[in-house]
């Protein structure tokens, strides 16, 4: 028998089937990592299941991948959630495609037992304890009775190892402590966060091309930012669960390697993008900028954004991103207005795309980026697949399920991919919306998809035992609105930490709004009047000058303004003023419940549009503007 030494522990290398993957790992053995590995390895050698507990980003799964990569042992990992059922792990019967019989498909736990593999129960405390107890014989005595199938007993083959991972219940959505009658069968190992010295040692090992002073600077920024969050100095009013750790630091280092390891401007810019930009409140941003500037020695120069498309490549400042449909990319860039806030937003998106990061676009409810969605999700020319989540949905709704064939015969069924599975197979851009409303039962199912594994395990009825992998060109976008109150659910900081958060800009400056409107409308009084009335209506609604009797204030967002513009486009006639007033009523005043308030807002609308001449050349100018745009905007 062959052996390998891991953290000074001699571990056997066992024979295994080659049909399951062995995940690579770049874990660096520091002193604390070595100690944690020993805490894991000795119970493993004794055949005792291990439960790893620790904060997001401390490397719980990385530890297992590291051990198994050295001993060449495949790992089957299943992301638990509140929707997990025993058959997801154990297996189930499915009808043959010809409808003339049934076949049994093993679940990942059954496969791990019968093949002698490692099984990782990821985020185990998201699952109800009564579900976990269905396979208690596995972690108690290393066997499983297939009650859902033939009833036979599957004994764990030599090499089988059961590992659970979980975040602490404190500070993580949907987590509850596992009862003692479950945990007593495990060797529970708490995985400590890395010390500053260990962070430096790890980063230096992984990124030897980066200067030591740069690594020390960003570690200090990360630690101070995390300390400020925990003390409530920043992020408190946001109601979001911010978190900075080694994963954030690795993102930063990857970006420096991509965009300029020795360029101080790049080093400062990426620090701002990762440690200042995610915060909503201006005072939080100011504190973070001050921290970053103090580390980098003064004010940080803002470089104007420049971009063009050539040779199937998007050149955007110092970024170069392949486009799979050059004509579509050029068309999108020509179809949407790009004032400075949008350019700054796009620069952050392109940075994350080139660095192959998952992107979380966050926005205020009245600043929904829906109107600009294709501009940042489809610029690479790859087809977009939307996965819309909501409360009450089941995992099968997005992953897939067995369904009757087109003939409708109940005895003939086939596996039908859900939108998430379909998009992975086809290599599409994946846009996951409704993250804030879906709850942990759906969101946490995507853990493997959004971390280093970049894969999704399908249920047994799919007939596929190997996880399906994201392609190189796939990008995962998440979209969520800001949390408005503590009673509103949000994503956990564990899930957030797998994404790069980018805030969609708040388009509220009158000059910016005029620039957006002047992209579609002739410059002058009309776009100026529309922008100013929009901001006035927003101000009155926010101050409750209108809607004071309502439980909820009126909301007027960028969507109202652009739909108003579209109305003028669609019904453009010689009397542009009347069309504009009608559009303003449709998208602003008609929703006002109080007749007096509605009348007053209509009076303001007519006042703001009083400068638009009743009969003018504006009609012809709008028609000419429409002809010059690449796509018809009506």
What positions do the PLM features span?
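C-terminal alpha-helical "lid" subdomain
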Residues: 250, 254-309, 562-629
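AAA+ P-loop NTPase catalytic core and its hallmark functional loops
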Residues: 1-238, 243, 247, 255-262, ...
């Amino acid at each position: 028998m062959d052996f390998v030494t891991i953290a000074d522990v001699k571990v056997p290398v066992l024979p295994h089937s080659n049909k399951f993957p062995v995940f690579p790992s770049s874990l660096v053995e520091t002193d604390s990592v070595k100690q944690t590995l020993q805490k894991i390895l000795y119970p493993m050698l004794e055949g005792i299941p291990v439960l790893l507990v620790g904060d997001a980003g401390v490397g719980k799964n990385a530890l297992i991948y590291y051990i198994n990569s050295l001993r060449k042992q495949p790992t089957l990992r299943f992301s638990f959630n509140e929707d997990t059922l025993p058959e997801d792990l154990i297996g189930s019967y499915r009808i043959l495609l010809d409808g003339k019989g049934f076949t049994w498909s093993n679940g990942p736990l059954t496969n791990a037992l019968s093949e002698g593999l490692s099984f990782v129960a990821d985020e185990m405390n998201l699952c109800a304890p009564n579900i976990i107890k269905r396979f208690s014989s596995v972690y108690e005595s290393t066997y499983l009775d297939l009650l859902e199938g033939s009833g036979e007993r599957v004994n764990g083959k030599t090499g089988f190892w059961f590992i659970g991972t979980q975040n602490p219940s404190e500070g993580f959505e949907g987590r509850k402590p596992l009862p003692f009658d479950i945990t007593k069968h495990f060797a529970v190992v708490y995985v400590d966060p890395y010390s500053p010295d260990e962070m430096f040692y790890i980063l230096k090992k992984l990124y030897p091309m980066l200067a030591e002073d740069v690594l020390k600077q960003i570690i200090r920024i990360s630690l101070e930012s995390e300390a400020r969050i925990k003390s409530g100095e920043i992020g408190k009013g946001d109601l979001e669960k911010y978190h900075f750790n080694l994963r954030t630091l690795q993102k930063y280092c990857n970006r420096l390697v991509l965009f300029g390891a020795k360029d101080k401007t790049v080093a400062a810019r990426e620090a701002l993008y990762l440690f200042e930009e995610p915060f909503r409140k201006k005072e939080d941003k100011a504190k973070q900028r001050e921290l970053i500037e103090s580390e980098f020695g003064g004010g940080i120069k803002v470089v104007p954004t420049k971009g063009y498309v050539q040779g199937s490549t998007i050149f955007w400042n110092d970024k170069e991103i392949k486009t799979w449909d050059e004509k579509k990319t050029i068309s999108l860039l020509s179809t949407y207005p790009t004032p400075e806030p949008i350019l700054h937003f796009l620069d952050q998106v392109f940075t994350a795309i080139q660095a192959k990061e998952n992107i979380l676009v966050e926005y205020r409810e009245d600043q929904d980026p829906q109107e600009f969605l294709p501009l940042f999700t489809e610029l690479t020319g790859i087809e977009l697949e939307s996965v819309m989540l909501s409360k009450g949905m089941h995992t099968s709704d997005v992953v897939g399920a067995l369904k009757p064939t087109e003939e409708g015969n109940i005895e003939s069924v086939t596996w039908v991919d859900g939108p998430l599975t379909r998009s992975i197979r086809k290599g599409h851009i994946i846009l996951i919306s409704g993250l804030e409303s879906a709850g942990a039962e759906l969101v946490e199912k995507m853990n493997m998809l959004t971390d280093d594994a970049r894969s999704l395990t399908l249920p047994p009825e799919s007939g596929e035992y190997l996880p399906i992998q994201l392609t190189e060109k796939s990008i995962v976008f998440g979209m969520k609105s800001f949390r408005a109150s503590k009673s509103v659910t949000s994503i956990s900081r564990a899930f957030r930490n797998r994404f790069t958060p980018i805030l969609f800009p708040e388009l509220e400056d009158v000059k910016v709004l005029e620039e957006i409107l002047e992209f579609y409308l002739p410059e002058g009084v009309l776009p100026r009047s529309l922008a100013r009335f929009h901001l006035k209506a927003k101000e009155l609604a926010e101050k409750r000058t209108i809607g004071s009797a309502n439980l909820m204030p009126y909301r007027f967002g960028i969507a109202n303004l652009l739909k108003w513009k579209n109305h003028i486009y669609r019904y453009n006639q010689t009397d542009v003023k009347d069309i504009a007033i009608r559009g303003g009523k449709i998208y602003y005043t008609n929703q006002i419940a109080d007749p007096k308030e509605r009348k007053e807002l209509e009076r303001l609308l007519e006042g703001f549009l009083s400068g638009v001449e009743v009969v003018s050349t504006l009609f012809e100018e709008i028609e000419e503007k429409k002809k010059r745009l690449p796509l018809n905007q009506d």
